[in-house]
Each structure stands twice: as C-alpha cells, then as structure tokens.
C-alpha cells in the first residue's frame, strides 16, 4: 500500500518532542507539509532541526503557541488558517493520589487534554467540510478505558476525548471528513521515562526499570515492552490517507494489546 500525502498540510499539536514529533516525522516522510507546535520556541527549533535531519527536504512550519488557551489558538490560526489533517496530541500527565488532586489540577487537565482538542476541531473542521476532505485524529490512551489509580484525572480526560471523537465524527458525517481516536499504550518517551522513575525509583538502570514497570504496573501488555513513538506515527499516517476514507468515529489501538478487549 502506497500512502502519498503530498499536497496535504498536517497540524500536530504538542509536537516539539515525544509522540507528537514522531507523528510529524512520519507524516512528513509520507509527503505532508507539517506544522510543529509547542510553547517553547527553542524546543521547536530543535524539533525542526531533528525532523529535517531525519526527513531531508521536508516542508515544515513552526508555530510557538499555547494551544491550551483560546489566545494560543488565535495565534496559530493567524499563521495556519487551513489544515487538511489535524492531530490533537497535546496533553499532560502525572501520578498523584486521587484524594490529593485539587480543583485547579482537575481543571488544568481538562483544559489541556480535552478543551484544546475541541477548540482546534471547531477551528478547522468547517473548512474541511467545505472542501469535502479532512482527517482529524485525537491521541487517546489506554488510560481512557483502564483507569490507572495513580492518575485518574488523566484517565478522565482521555475517556472524555473518546466521547468528543465520536460526537464530532457524527457532526462530520457525509462530508468527506473522518474523525478518529488512537488509543496508545505505554510509550517510550522522555516524559514516560520520568514517570517510570517516579513509580519504580530512579536508581535502576533503564532496561531494568522498564521491565519492572511493565511487570508491576502494566502487566496486561501482550508485547511486554514500551511502544516506540514511530509505531504510533505509522497508524496516524494510515488514518490521514485516502485509504482510510471508510474509517471514522472509531478508537483504533496502538497499545501492544494492553486493553483486554477484542473490540475494536
């Protein structure tokens, strides 16, 4: 199967590192012009340099803006008024006992992980429907369906994002625009390395820490390892393609078999 995204513009929120940057790399490799986003201009410069090293000749736009705010979305819109592919990847996570999560933290998690995606969909979906083509993907998590006791606030936001996905898919029905979620499992990023250290201790070598984390905290995984960000990028490339035109309103999994279900 040959996937060619030449002529498409793809916006990936929260793409200065980790999963977001890996998604941008794979979309660029497939021919899309990619829009990198983050709050730090210096981090975005580094991300752009890394992407161009991995994908020479890639077409890249960099927009420093906090997309967890309405003002940040306005800044983005002024630079990138139309996109063909929207990947809502922006998100925060962290471990905290349930009773220690105060109102401000609950609110912050919702604003960053859910409301940012809603704003971007509201911003870009109308032009997609007018053009008769568009792809929207929301990066969710196994925590949406297997709520971890150490971060129920994060799990709540990812469950909400599944509902947002299905609802906007219905709103876009028959327009040529598809809207999907991608449920990702434990993924090897710098942020997850820090998270693993919080749970199993920072005195272990990485290979041992990863193995301990998977055994003690994610034993349901069928692959027994962290997922590589590129593996998520591969799914996003498919969902962004013409070949995925009949796939919408769903929650596709790149979770290493972590979620114990035969559906989807």
Residue ranges and their predicted role:
Residues 126, 170-171:
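Alpha-helical segment proximal to the catalytic Tyr-Lys
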Residues 121, 157, 165:
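Active-site helix of classical SDR
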Residues 9, 16-17:
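Conserved glycine-rich cofactor-binding loop
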Residues 173, 178, 247-249:
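Short, small/polar-rich loop/turn modules that mediate ligand/substrate recognition or access, typified
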Residues 146, 236-237, 248-264:
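Short C-terminal tail/terminal secondary-structure segment
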Residues 97-98, 105-110, 136, 217:
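Substrate-binding pocket helix/loop in short-chain dehydrogenase/reductase
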Residues 141:
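Residue(s) in the substrate-gating loop at a strand-loop-helix junction
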């Amino acid at each position: 199967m040959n996937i060619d995204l030449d002529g498409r513009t793809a916006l990936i929120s929260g793409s200065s590192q980790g999963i977001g940057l890996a998604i941008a790399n794979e979309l660029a490799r497939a021919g899309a012009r990619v829009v990198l986003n983050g709050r730090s201009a210096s981090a975005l410069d580094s991300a752009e340099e890394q992407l161009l090293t991995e994908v020479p000749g890639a077409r890249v736009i960099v927009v420093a803006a906090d997309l967890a705010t309405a003002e940040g979305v306005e800044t983005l819109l002024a630079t990138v008024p139309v996109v063909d592919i929207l990947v809502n990847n922006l998100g925060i996570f962290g471990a905290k006992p349930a009773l220690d999560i105060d109102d401000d933290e609950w609110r912050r998690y919702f604003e960053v992980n859910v409301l940012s995606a809603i704003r971007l969909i509201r911003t870009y979906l109308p032009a997609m429907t007018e053009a008769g083509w568009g792809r929207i993907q929301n990066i969710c998590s196994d925590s949406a369906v297997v709520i971890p006791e150490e971060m129920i606030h994060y799990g709540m936001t990812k469950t909400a994002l599944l509902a947002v996905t299905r609802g906007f898919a219905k709103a876009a029905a028959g327009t040529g625009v598809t809207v999907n979620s991608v449920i990702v499992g434990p993924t090897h990023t710098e942020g997850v390395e820090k998270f693993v250290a919080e749970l199993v201790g920072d005195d272990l070598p990485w290979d041992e820490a990863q193995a301990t984390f998977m055994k003690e905290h994610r034993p349901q995984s069928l692959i027994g390892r962290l997922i590589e960000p590129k593996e998520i990028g591969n799914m996003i490339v498919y969902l962004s393609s013409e070949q995925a035109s009949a796939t919408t309103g769903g929650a596709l999994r790149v979770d290493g078999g972590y979620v114990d279900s035969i559906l989807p």
